[in-house]
Regions:
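Short alpha-helical segments that sit at the start of domains
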Residues: 123-160
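Long, low-complexity intrinsically disordered regions enriched in small/polar
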Residues: 1-50
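Short helix-coil junctions and helix-kink-helix linkers
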Residues: 165-181
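Short terminal targeting/anchoring segments
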Residues: 45-81
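Long, low-complexity, charged/polar intrinsically disordered regions in eukaryotic proteins
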Residues: 83-138
Length: 369
């Protein structure tokens, strides 16, 4: 009977398994997370010499404190999930990886992954994927992480306005600045680390120019010629005087909705028109939702009258935003990278890297819709 009661206590508690040492916790407070991380790693530290042990303990303390600081900021309501054995094992793997490397980048990436890990449901594919990412990240050099980020960026589609797209491209500055250090060995190693699969002789991705011309068919165009622009503005009772644009008041009151849709265009002082949206699908979807399908031919005429960029002009568009794009585009157009397809763990690690470095959330789910 006594044995059954003891078993009952264990079943109702948290079991920590660390190198054969079993510990039971019947409750968890937020400050206990540091002690949990230390405990699940403790038995592994025995392999270090006295001098190395001191450094290992310092790194473990730093990692634990930094983890709790970020947890408190981002997911303070989920701290008690550290009572779950699977999450403790993930924390153990992440902490040990940093103890071994002591690399600042490793710590940032691993803590970011643990924050994601705390937020997902157990026994899901996403949970398994994050656990795998925690094991894979310590194997990757900073150059490999940057390469994954670049490949993910190439595969993303941005929908919005011209200025926001420029801002989005510019936010890659820190990554493309380091692009020259990425080597063929980094590309090959991603296959060994199960982040990508390479199929030599088969192109899995379009070249940079072709992809952007196809995906963003409005941004990469020259302005609409003056005569076509003038006819368009005349139809919508617009006039331009010394760089100032005005609408006929009566026309505005009668056709307010169509006037609002003109925000998809940029009207220049020289009398030409450019497109303010990234692509024609977004433009036409907006017209349809506003009940303005009758005006679609007018916008189609603008598009047909404007000349598409050539490949050199597409490249120059990026380089004018940041000169480091020159090397990054050359890198991504290598045959060895065009034959690469991201595996889920590589896609996920690259997505988290982009989210962290760009300062905006890049949803992983968009790749699997």
């Amino acid at each position: 009977m006594g044995d059954k009661q003891e078993i009952s206590k264990i079943l109702d508690s948290t079991v920590l398994q660390a190198g054969g040492d079993l510990t039971i916790n019947t409750g968890l407070r937020a400050p206990d997370v540091i002690e949990i991380v230390k405990e699940v790693v403790a038995s592994e530290l025995a392999v270090y010499t006295r001098e190395a042990d001191k450094k290992a303990v310092e790194r473990l303390q730093r990692f634990s404190e930094d983890l709790v600081e970020v947890l408190a900021k981002k997911v303070s309501d989920k701290l008690n999930r550290f009572n779950k054995p699977a999450l403790q094992i993930a924390a153990r793997d992440a902490a040990l990886s940093f103890v071994r490397s002591g690399d600042d980048l490793d710590e940032k990436v691993l803590i970011d992954l643990l924050i994601e890990r705390v937020s997902v449901e157990e026994h899901t594919t996403m949970q398994r994927l994050i656990d795998q990412a925690i094991r894979v990240v310590p194997m990757l050099s900073p150059a490999c992480l940057d390469l994954l980020s670049l490949v993910v960026f190439r595969n993303l589609s941005y929908i919005g306005t011209r200025d926001k797209m420029v801002e989005w491209i510019r936010s890659m500055g820190a990554i493309i600045q380091r692009a020259p250090r990425i080597s063929n060995l980094d590309i090959a190693f991603l296959s060994q680390a199960d982040c990508v699969v390479s199929v030599p002789g088969i192109t899995m991705s379009s070249r940079w120019c072709d992809y952007f011309l196809d995906r963003y068919d409005l941004i990469f165009r020259h302005p609409v010629p003056c005569d076509v622009s003038a006819s368009f503005m005349e139809k919508f009772s617009m006039n331009c005087d010394n760089g100032s644009f005005a609408f006929d008041k009566a026309y505005w009151e009668k056709n307010g909705t169509i006037i609002e849709s003109l925000s998809a265009l940029l009207f220049h002082f020289d009398g030409t028109i450019s497109f303010n949206l990234t692509d024609s699908k977004t433009l036409y979807d907006g017209l349809q939702k506003a009940g303005l399908d009758d005006f679609k031919p007018d916008f189609e005429l603008l598009i047909e009258s404007s000349q598409r960029f050539n490949c050199d002009e597409v490249r120059r568009f990026f380089v004018d935003i940041d000169p480091n794009w020159e090397h990054a585009i050359t890198l991504l157009d290598k045959d060895s990278l065009l034959s690469v397809q991201l595996l889920p763990v590589g896609q996920y690690i690259g997505t988290r890297q982009l989210s962290r470095l760009m300062g905006r959330e890049v949803p992983f789910g968009v790749f699997y819709q």
